[in-house]
């Protein structure tokens, strides 16, 4: 549960009220998970012990944002959580794409697209550049896959990257992370 308050004093009062109400229902606040967090941004410039929290897989903390006029400022924004980023990184590693040299790119795309689409649909809603940075790891594994699959690319990862970039230009929708913006040619789309 997240409760917003205008001041620290009001937050302490609200926490006490919530604790009383939960006690009436035979429940109690988890002291380990219950924090008062200062939502630092361009208008709130103070400091507090806790300036970030994780909720539903997102980490909310002060982040740089761009105004509609092109200027940058600090805002309190959600992005994929640190624990979720690590978990997804482990899943990507566990796929061992680079070792599947008997498979085609289409086979690899069919194997991973459903899961990647789920990640992009959920975690890509806010601060998508954090997720794009994570999804570019898939491209690194695909480059290694190309080096294993094709003898002419074996010791030339730059050529393998160009090979994948050519595939992207021919079939930009082959992989879900390419459609999301994690392109194999080193550019990103819509992740600014």
Residue ranges and their predicted role:
Residues 1-192:
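Non-catalytic terminal/accessory segments
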């Amino acid at each position: 549960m997240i409760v917003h308050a205008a001041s620290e004093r009001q937050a302490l009062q609200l926490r006490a009220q919530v604790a009383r109400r939960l006690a009436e229902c035979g429940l109690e606040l988890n002291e380990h998970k219950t924090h008062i967090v200062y939502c630092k941004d361009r208008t709130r410039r103070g400091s507090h012990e806790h300036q970030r929290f994780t909720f539903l897989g997102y980490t909310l903390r002060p982040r740089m944002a761009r105004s509609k006029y092109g200027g940058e400022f600090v805002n309190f924004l959600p992005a994929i959580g640190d624990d979720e980023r690590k978990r997804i990184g482990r899943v990507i590693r566990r796929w061992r794409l680079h070792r599947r040299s008997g498979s085609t790119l289409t086979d690899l795309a069919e194997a991973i697209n459903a899961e990647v689409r789920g990640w992009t649909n959920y975690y890509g809603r806010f601060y998508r550049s954090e997720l794009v940075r994570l999804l570019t790891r898939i491209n690194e594994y695909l480059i290694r896959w190309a080096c294993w699959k094709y003898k002419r690319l074996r010791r030339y990862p730059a050529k393998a990257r160009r090979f994948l970039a050519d595939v992207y230009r021919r079939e930009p929708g082959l992989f879900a992370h390419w459609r999301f913006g994690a392109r194999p040619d080193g550019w990103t789309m819509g992740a600014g």
